[in-house]
Every structure is written in C-alpha cells, then in structure tokens.
Amino acid sequence: MTDITTSHRIEIAAPPERVWEALTTPDQISQWFFGVDTESDWQVGSSIVHRGEYQGRPYEDRGEIVELDRPRRFVHTHWSATSGLPDAPENYQRVLWAVEPSSDGTAVTVAEDNLPSEDAKAISDRSWPQALENLRALLEG
C-alpha cells in the first residue's frame, strides 16, 4: 500500500437520488465517465468492470464493490492493466464515492487511495475533475 491519495468534490444542482442513479446505472455512467461500458450488480462482494478505449487502445479495469450504503456512499477497489502493475491485491486502489445533500442539491466526493505513483496521482487529478464536470453537465443539462 502507498500513502498517495487524491480527492475531488463538486456541487450538483440535482437531488441525491438522481445523482446516485447516474453513478450506478451503466448507460448513464458511459455518458459522464469517458464512454466506458460498466458491468456490476452493485452488491457488496460483486465485481465492477469498466471497459473502454484510452489513447486508441482498448482496456478493461476491474475491482470489487466493498461497501454500499444507498444512496449515500459506495466504495470499490480498482485495478487497471494500463498501470503496468500485476493484477495483485496490493496494486488495487480503493475508490470512495460520497453523495451528500447540500444547499445547492448534492455534494459529490470521489477519493482514491493506494495510488502507485505521483504520475498515477497526476493522471487521477486530471481525470476525476473532468469526470465530475461531465456528471454535473449530464444532471444539470
């Protein structure tokens, strides 16, 4: 495990239940999360798989749902072959999604830990804000 983490937050003018739906419904996920195809049955212990294309190359990221508290919070592990690291437990990140009512609608936080390097953190620090902006555009559009 590493101590490298990142966290990003955004306010969205939509109710928490609507945000939760966009975070956990595959056809909506693809609209805000860079066109990925997502598979999961959203149960603790179940797999979560994201398939897509990055820089012209297909990829498959995978993990497991480890915590689920509808419609407030879910946590899943995450490993990507694009990391270049072996598919081993110590190479999985933990991704936390928190959905909280706010005066403007909903505050959404995504946090990631056990990032393998500062370079990986830099990629996350570019990707998560864009994904959250895409989520807001989908829900407020």
Listing of model-derived features with the role each one plays in the protein:
Residues D113-G141:
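A conserved amphipathic terminal alpha-helix motif
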Residues V19-W20, I29, I48-H50, I65, ...:
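Hydrophobic pocket/interface hotspot
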Residues Q31, T38-Q43, R57-S103, D113:
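Hydrophobic-ligand binding "helix-grip"
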